[in-house]
């Protein structure tokens, strides 16, 4: 991502002594100011946690994922059957064999509903936890914590779409970032950092400053101004001044290494790898919109989850991973029999690898993985071999984060259509995530944080069973 090049022998892995880096970081770089750029140290209101939100864009079926309903009629129950988990009496959809063996490390919610069945409205609602500003939870985190971690230079809020790890793939992956990374009423400077910004932006974000001029403020500022002009000319990135400051922070801390998957052990990359789960050619050929169907492919998901793990280790506070392709209406669109045989195993492999990886690194208590989508699917399979939009029940899973795992929360009715016990709301989702990220009592004492923001961040109620 961001590299500072030197023409002299390195004092450290970035090429400069700690004192030089501190001096550079202290330079007054005109025009780079932005509200709440840095997390404030010493107040203890930010917990040592990271949230990774895996968003199954398009709307995953509750039946084919975590609530198979095999006792229901054939037109309702999971098309691909069920698999026993390591929790007594709990079953997952037939494609989740690896995760079934880890159910004791998961908390599956079977009673989450919000009642919205429109893609854009539902996706933005879920990503925001239903908060009235419309800002996604990652942006809320960034608003309170600062857009850049002052201790390590990491972006506080990052979005990982397929193109972030598959930049050379010609297909257009069907990720819709604006639906899951919206800043709502907040300033756009609190938007997610997107490493897939496109074009030459990533290459342009390399400042060429010789070592003998590194302490020359005018030289450094000039280089940054050049970077800003390039960023301003790209429609992929807005609010360049704030991003530019973020880029300097990333630059000075060598954070770019966190985005480099080549640093990983090839055997670990293989454990995450989902490249084998491409959409079958036959499924593409019989569809009218072939490019759209190709874009449903989950071949990048393994790398996305691996990158998420690297960012967790590097200190990013909120990470959203987009997994497109879950809108399975059937006919000329994706059918369940087209989509689940590739999407299901891809999620099963990538997420199970992530859980094992996090555990092996001692990060289970620190990292909270949340798996959901904009809504669920209709109880009855339609005449086209698909399921339609259904906002009355939505898949929701939690893993880690120091919460209580190994349980199923809530219950749906016999048709898997409505909650019949313990209905969970988006406000509960918001409360659980904000409680994980912040000491909300201390957030209330922040003099520089507007009261309305404090109210929104603290408005949710954590899911009782998880705390």
Where are these regions (language model features)?
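Ligand-binding pockets and gating/stacking loops
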Residues: 1-467
């Amino acid at each position: 991502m961001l590299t500072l090049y030197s023409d002299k022998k390195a004092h450290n892995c970035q090429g400069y002594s700690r004192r030089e880096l501190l001096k550079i970081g202290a330079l007054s770089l005109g025009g780079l100011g932005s509200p709440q750029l840095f997390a404030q140290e010493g107040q203890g209101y930010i917990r040592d946690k990271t949230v990774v939100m895996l968003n199954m864009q398009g709307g995953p079926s509750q039946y084919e994922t975590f609530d198979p309903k095999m006792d229901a009629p054939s037109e309702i129950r999971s098309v691909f059957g069920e698999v026993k988990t390591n929790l007594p009496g709990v079953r997952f959809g037939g494609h989740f064999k690896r995760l079934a063996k880890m159910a004791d490390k998961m908390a599956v919610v079977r009673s989450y509903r919000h009642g919205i069945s429109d893609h854009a409205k539902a996706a933005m609602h879920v990503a925001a936890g239903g908060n009235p500003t419309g800002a996604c939870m990652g942006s809320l985190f960034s608003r309170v914590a600062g857009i850049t971690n002052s201790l390590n230079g990491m972006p506080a809020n990052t979005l990982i779409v397929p193109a972030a790890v598959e930049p050379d793939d010609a297909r257009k992956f069907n990720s819709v970032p604006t639906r899951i990374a919206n800043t709502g009423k907040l300033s756009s400077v609190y938007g997610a950092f997107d490493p897939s910004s496109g074009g030459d932006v990533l290459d342009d974000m390399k400042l060429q400053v010789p070592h003998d001029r590194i302490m020359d403020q005018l030289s450094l500022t000039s280089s940054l101004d050049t970077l800003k002009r390039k960023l301003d000319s790209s429609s992929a990135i807005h609010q360049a001044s704030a991003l530019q400051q973020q880029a300097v922070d990333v630059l000075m801390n060598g954070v770019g290494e966190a985005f480099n998957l080549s640093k990983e052990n090839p055997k670990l990359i293989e454990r995450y790898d989902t490249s084998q789960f491409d959409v079958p050619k036959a499924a593409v050929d019989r569809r009218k919109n072939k490019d759209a169907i190709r874009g449903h492919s989950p071949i990048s998901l393994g790398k996305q989850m691996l990158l998420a793990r690297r960012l967790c280790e590097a200190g990013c506070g909120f990470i959203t991973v987009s997994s497109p392709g879950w809108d399975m209406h059937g006919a000329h669109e994706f059918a369940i029999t087209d989509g689940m045989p590739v999407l299901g195993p891809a999620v099963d492999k990538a997420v199970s690898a992530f859980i094992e990886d996090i555990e092996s690194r001692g990060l289970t208590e620190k990292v909270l993985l949340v798996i959901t989508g904009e809504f669920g699917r209709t109880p009855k399979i339609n005449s086209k071999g698909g399921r339609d939009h259904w906002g009355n029940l939505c898949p929701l899973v939690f893993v880690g984060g120091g919460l209580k795992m190994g349980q199923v929360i809530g219950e749906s009715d016999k048709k898997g259509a409505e909650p019949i016990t313990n209905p969970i709301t988006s406000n509960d989702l918001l409360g659980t995530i904000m409680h994980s990220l912040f000491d909300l009592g201390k957030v209330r004492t922040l003099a520089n944080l507007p009261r309305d923001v404090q109210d929104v961040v603290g408005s949710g109620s954590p899911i009782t069973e998880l705390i």
